A protein has these predicted regions:
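Extracytosolic ligand-binding ectodomains
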Residues: 1-381
Length: 381
């Protein structure tokens, strides 16, 4: 008789995040419809979006004998679940992107900044951009991005020449953009040069002065690219202000991460035209979101894809070869798995390694500058 595989999925099905939790559960159910046979059973457990609720949900899951836990969503909930799962040797594939909760049988499927930063910097350096400015939110995410950038540039002999943090709740970025653009010095240099030219009576000086009438600044900034890890209206506001203070593309390239892909109408902001950003390949993702809308009549949250991929991963492992389907050795298969968000593989340290394509923003969307990998290089090779 075939082995029954029990998998628990821990989600906030009540509380403030219940709608998001339901969308993740819906996505998991699509994977079951697509791939599972009668020997795969998934059991949902409500974390209530709290640490206490997550602990109770994990205890219920291990009590019925689950072989693997998918979720929870929040890093604090993952911390609460870890000791419960570890006590019975059950691995956890969580939807968090916090590397701090990864390891020792806990694998995070979320998109960690390090890999995205590495991808975009690798491409930018290949295009000759070695001097970087960065404008990051003053929070854990922003600090993680900056740390990732420091690691990425060090191995490529590039450097950070300007770094500014901003309040993640801010709406006015004028001072910040003006400072990083070194606008006051460059504007002063223009005024001084104009004054100098006005004192001359030769034709060349007069022609030069006429050309300078349309400028606000003189001289270049001391960086080749600006990393903007923000998204949405903040991203658009900062990019627009940088252009206002004479930091223009393609002379200085604006760079972004995968959250740019969730910024609505990014192509409508002229100052972001020609920017580059790292993003997961979109073909399978678009198919998944289309099917989700067909099933449920609404568009899911962006991270719903993680629940689909985690469930699909569990089903594939359950259906292949005999033995311990969800052992750590099998979870970290070096060839990886092809998911909604592209190729990924779980690493022994508990982080999902992912592939990214490099996109350039255009007036009607984007063009792919470098496609994502379709196979992983050998680990350690």
């Amino acid at each position: 008789e075939a082995t029954k595989h029990k998998v628990g999925i821990l989600l906030p099905l009540t509380g403030r995040q219940k709608l998001l939790g339901q969308e993740l559960l819906d996505a998991a159910q699509i994977a079951v419809f697509d791939l599972a046979d009668e020997n795969f059973v998934i059991y949902p457990f409500d974390t209530q979006g709290t640490e206490t609720g997550a602990t109770a949900a994990a205890e219920k899951a291990v009590r019925i004998g689950v072989d693997l836990i998918l979720g929870p969503l929040l890093a604090s909930s993952v911390r609460a679940v870890r000791p419960v799962a570890s006590s019975v040797g059950v691995s956890v594939v969580a939807f968090s992107n916090s590397h701090e909760v990864a390891g020792d049988g806990v694998y995070i499927l979320g998109f960690v900044p390090q890999q995205q930063v590495d991808a975009i910097v690798d491409y930018a350096v290949g295009e000759g951009l070695y001097r970087y400015a960065v404008l990051a939110p003053q929070d854990a995410y922003g600090q993680e991005v900056v740390a990732a950038l420091k690691r990425a540039i060090t191995v490529r002999e590039a450097k950070i020449v300007r770094l500014e943090y901003y309040d993640p709740t801010a709406t006015d970025f004028s001072r910040l953009a003006k400072a990083i653009a070194d606008y006051d010095r460059r504007h002063k240099a223009l005024l001084e040069h104009r004054a100098e030219l006005k004192m001359r009576d030769d034709q060349v000086s007069k022609q030069t002065l006429k050309r300078l009438e349309t400028l606000d600044t003189l001289g270049d900034v001391d960086f080749d690219a600006v990393l903007l890890p923000g998204r949405g209206q903040q991203l658009k506001a900062i990019a627009s202000l940088l252009s206002f203070y004479d930091v223009d593309q393609p002379a200085v390239r604006l760079l972004g991460l995968s959250n740019w892909a969730q910024t609505a109408n990014i192509e409508a902001e002229p100052s972001l035209n020609l920017s580059w950003y790292a993003a997961p390949p979109r073909d399978e993702r678009e198919k998944f979101f289309r099917r989700y809308r067909e099933y449920y009549g609404r568009a899911p949250a962006a991270i719903a894809s993680l629940a689909y991929d985690a469930t699909a991963l569990a089903i594939v492992l359950a259906q292949s070869q005999t033995g311990l389907a969800f052992s750590r050795k099998r979870l970290v298969q070096p060839y990886g798995f092809l998911g909604v968000d592209g190729l990924f593989r779980l690493r022994s340290e508990g982080i999902a390694e992912r592939v990214f394509e490099i996109r350039e923003v255009t007036r009607d969307g984007f063009r792919i500058k470098r496609p994502a990998l379709t196979t992983f290089p050998r680990i350690g090779g």
